[in-house]
Structure formats: C-alpha cells, structure tokens
Amino acid sequence: ELEEGLTHTINYFSDIPLFLEVEASYSCNYFCPRCPRQVLGHEGRTGFLSDELFGILFQEVKKYRIPSINLSHGGESLLRKDLPELIRKSKDNGVLDIMIHTNGSLLNKQLSIDLIQSGLTKINFSLDAVSPQIYGKLRSEGNYEKVISNINDFIEVRNKIGRSYPRIRLSFVVCDENIHEQEAFYELWEDKVNVIAFQQFYDFSKGKDSDGVNSSNLGCVPY
C-alpha cells in the first residue's frame, strides 16, 4: 500500500516536493564531539518547532499531497513529548512515509508502543559502535547498554504487536575510532533490523571550504 501510494504520487504530482525534512526538535540530550551541532557552533540551539508552525505545515502538506516527511534533523526527536501525535497528524493529513532519527536513549516500552501505533513508517537509530568503550568516545553523554536495551525492546514490541512497520534502520558512521567494529556491528544486528547503513564521515567544519574535504580528517554525522 505504501509503495503503491508513493508511485501514484510520483507519477501524478512530480511538480511538487516529494519529501520534507522538518526539525521538530532543535534540542539534543547528547553532546557528541564530532556532531555538526558542535562543529558549526549550534550546540546552544534549543527548543521546538511551534504548534502554530506545525499547523501551517500540515495545511500545506495536505494541500499539496506531500508523500514523505522526516520529523528530525539536527536535534533529538524523542525530546518532543508530542512526537507520536505529530506522526498521527502527518498521517491524517495524507503523508504516506513518515520517519524519525534518534539516538535511542529516551525510548521506553510505552513510547515504543505509541510510536509503532502512530503510523510511523521508518525509524533510524544512530549508533556507530558495538562496544561501550567506542560508544563513549563518540557519544560522550551516552549509556551504551541502555541504548542497546531500548533498541531491542523496540524490536520486541514491534514484533509482538505484529507490525512490519516502522522499518528499523541502524546507522554506523565509519571513522578512525570505530572502523575496527564495523564487521561486528553488522553481525550483531543483521538478523534483527531491516536496514544497516554504513556511512562515510563528513567534516562539516571543512564543508565551507570550496577546495573540498580532506578525506583523511573526516567527522561523524548521524543519519
């Protein structure tokens, strides 16, 4: 149903945006050393997109039949207590593909149920490690064991409910600190989630340089 709806939209409404990315939360509960928030000086940016702006957004989404939306960008999406409701409103206004990105630290079983039943179609967990030691280097505020437990609980809840959605994606941004864990990461998660994504580093501090990025000094960005 989702694939058919997206195909219909692409065929008949290709003159409108097919995808929107909305920063529902500007805030983040982590302070990751290589995150663009720190590199670009956005670490002090906090707050949430207002209900008023979301109301306008949903009107436009419905009017133009936007098929796909990501309710995350640079902040931590789960800091919004009303996130499941925003997902439901997206669905009620005709969005077919609704995704979020999260570090997973704020999940619990009830929130997992709420997200799964809200109409969410994709969730991405930014993990980047397979050990507490490496996770601690990349996620200075993070608790690896808690995050892993939260992700496993989410998988278990989705399977118990009997849903095939949301599709679960784990991202691993390859850098000097974690490259030796890449294979173990795949082996740990290959039978548990729908997608495992290995991504290359990008140093946002050098992104302003028109001469390009030095591939030997790349920085992590969660996807």
Identify what each model region corresponds to.
Residues 1-122, 133, 137, 141, ...:
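Conserved alpha-helical substructure of the radical SAM core
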Residues 23, 44, 49-52, 56-59, ...:
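Radical SAM enzyme [4Fe-4S]-AdoMet core and its adjacent flexible, acidic
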